[in-house]
A protein has these predicted regions:
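Glycine-rich, highly charged phosphate/nucleotide-binding loops
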Residues: 98-107
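A short, small-residue-rich loop immediately preceding and capping a beta-strand
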Residues: 113-134, 146-149
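Catalytic or ion-coupling anion/metal-binding cores of large enzyme and transporter domains
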Residues: 2-56, 61-80, 87-88, 93-98, ...
């Protein structure tokens, strides 16, 4: 067997020998030559679609990755998986499909690669669920693989982005701006291709994946348009051939230490609460034990230093302009915050990758020094108490305060809550409770971006809190707590809260409680009846039957 045959572990089973003549005939029709049958096959999973600006350019990046694979002596084969648009679906029934799409992306990458016999993979993602979906798919297959991020969008006119539009809706409801002004913001906020422009979920997860070692250095911090992203895609296609030669696979890279690095980088960047959910799910895919407690312990020793939206003032494109996250990671490594001995897709360790990285330019204030942090410990606060015995996730930078106490205003679902905020039913001093939005109860664990944006737009950001068994967009800010477990559909305490109950959220003690006795909660539980799901067939019904708790990453293969 030749060295090249050693690199064809999977494709050789599909196309070698006289018995495989039908398979070769099919491949000749899509462009294979005699010479191509002797090459390793690199699958290139593209999430291209015209349903969202996050992904509208990824077809071109897939072609670059194919060129890179071919230039390195492999044969690149492009295939597509799906994407949805959180920005379009938020606030609607369609958002129930968002988290489901993470599983569909992972499943489809596994299905196509397993069927076709690709020897290695490049996956390219743009919108939020693409990133964890691609990583979970690659992790399950455990073949030499690299992730490429589609890149960030440019700011809209007046330093606007998609969150500017969501919050304009609330400003209009308050009477601060006219419908014409809302339309003016709407028309300029999204100027072209790329993922949403703050440290929202897409940029958070791309940064986490780079810190994890599963993308090439710099991939998370490049504009969607321009030469850097095309080059990143080409080099990824080339590098998979090197990973094949090294036999370096996702499980060699996605180790416990690598996940700790990813968590600490997410914290430094003030990243999205969705990172908790997705990192738990990605760890599950490689059998790395990761729990909410790990976020607690690492959070105690990890400062927030990035002044990025939604909590800060800068956009991702401004971080790109000063060097991206590589200088931050170099600072963190030098300060002993990262494990430098972990392997990455370069074939080198993280420390080796960062050895020659220059620091940020003098005078920039996007990334602060560690001795002048925005917050000395994590903004991702894991809360427990009689309202969430299995844990909840809050994003608290300190600007919102560290404690909130108020009376419950309860809604069964997002739509009622949004209406209550916009029509003035929600009053200062209240805790908005949105329940039956968990992974099973929604189903799909919708993001509460429309309600949180309405809260901010109505000027209630410091006057109310919002808690839910659903999730939040990376663009949400304010005093918000999500991922409450057990969820309402499972009979968790959030299902037992009544209007007027006193709720206390304390980030310093990491507690979330309802001021109701155990006896009263027990009595309410006897009267509680699980609502019947309206989904009896199809993907949402299947998802609700198989999905795990949010505290376990909301995965669908944990208890099979």
């Amino acid at each position: 067997m030749s060295d090249k045959d050693d690199l064809r572990k999977y494709s050789s089973q599909v196309i070698d020998g006289v018995e495989a003549a039908p398979a070769r005939a099919m491949l000749r029709a899509v462009g294979f030559t005699d010479a191509d049958f002797d090459k390793p096959q690199i699958g290139i999973a593209s999430t291209w679609a015209m349903v969202t600006p996050c992904n509208m350019h990824i077809d071109k990046l897939a072609l670059e990755a194919e060129k890179g694979a071919n230039a390195a002596g492999a044969k690149g084969v492009i295939f597509n998986t799906i994407t949805i648009s959180d920005g379009i679906a938020n606030g609607t029934e369609g958002m129930k499909y968002s988290l489901v799409s993470r599983e569909v992306i992972a499943d489809s990458i596994e299905v196509v690669t397993g069927c076709e016999g690709f020897d290695g993979l490049v996956t390219i993602g743009g919108c939020d669920k693409n990133m964890p979906g691609c990583l979970i798919g690659m992790a399950r297959l455990n073949r030499p693989s690299i992730f490429v991020y589609g890149g960030t969008i440019q700011p809209g006119a007046g330093h606007t982005d998609i969150i500017s539009v969501f919050e304009a809706v609330g400003q209009h409801a308050r009477g601060d701006i006219s419908e014409i002004q809302v339309k003016q913001i709407e028309e300029v906020a999204i100027p072209g291709p790329g993922s949403c422009g703050g440290m929202y979920t897409a940029n958070t997860m791309a940064s986490a994946i780079e810190a994890l070692g599963m993308s090439l250095p710099g991939s998370s911090s490049q504009d969607a348009i321009g030469g850097d992203k095309a080059s990143d895609s080409f080099r990824a296609g080339q590098q998979v051939m090197e990973l094949l030669k090294l036999d370096l696979k996702p499980r060699d890279i996605m180790t416990r230490k690598a996940f700790e690095n990813a968590i600490r980088v997410v914290i430094a960047l003030a990243g999205s609460t969705n990172a908790v959910l997705h990192l738990l799910a990605m760890a599950n895919a490689v059998d790395v034990e990761l729990t909410l407690d790990d976020f607690v312990e690492l959070g105690k020793i990890s400062p927030v230093v990035a002044d990025l939206r939604p909590s800060g003032k800068y956009m991702m494109s401004e971080l790109v302009a000063i060097g991206g996250i590589q200088p931050l990671m170099k600072r963190m490594l030098d300060a002993g915050m990262l494990h430098g001995d972990v392997l990455t897709v370069t074939g080198q360790t993280l420390a080796e990758n960062l050895a020659g990285v220059p620091d940020y330019p003098v005078g920039q204030d996007v990334i602060r020094p560690f001795d002048q942090p925005i917050k000395k410990d994590s903004h991702l606060v894991i809360l427990r108490g009689n309202l969430s015995p299995n844990g909840a996730v809050a994003k608290i930078t300190g600007k919102e305060g560290l404690r909130f106490e108020g009376t419950a205003r309860v809604y069964h679902g997002e739509e009622g809550a949004l209406a209550g905020i916009l029509n003035g039913e929600v009053q200062p001093g209240e805790v908005i409770v949105i329940r039956y939005e968990g992974p099973k109860g929604g189903p799909g664990m919708r993001e509460m971006l429309s309600p949180t944006s309405a809260v901010m737009g109505k000027g209630l950001g410091k006057e109310v809190a919002l808690i839910t068994d659903g999730r939040f967009s990376g663009g949400s800010h304010g005093f918000v707590v999500g991922h409450i477990t057990p969820e309402a559909f499972e009979g968790g305490p959030i299902a037992l809260v009544e209007n007027g109950d006193r709720i206390i959220i304390d980030a310093q003690t990491r507690q979330i409680t309802v001021d109701v006795s155990d006896a009263v909660l027990a009595e309410r539980k006897t009267r509680w009846v699980r609502p019947e799901s309206k989904y009896k067939r199809g993907v949402l019904a299947k998802y609700a039957k198989t999905v795990s708790s949010a505290s376990e990453g909301a995965v669908t293969d944990k208890y099979l």
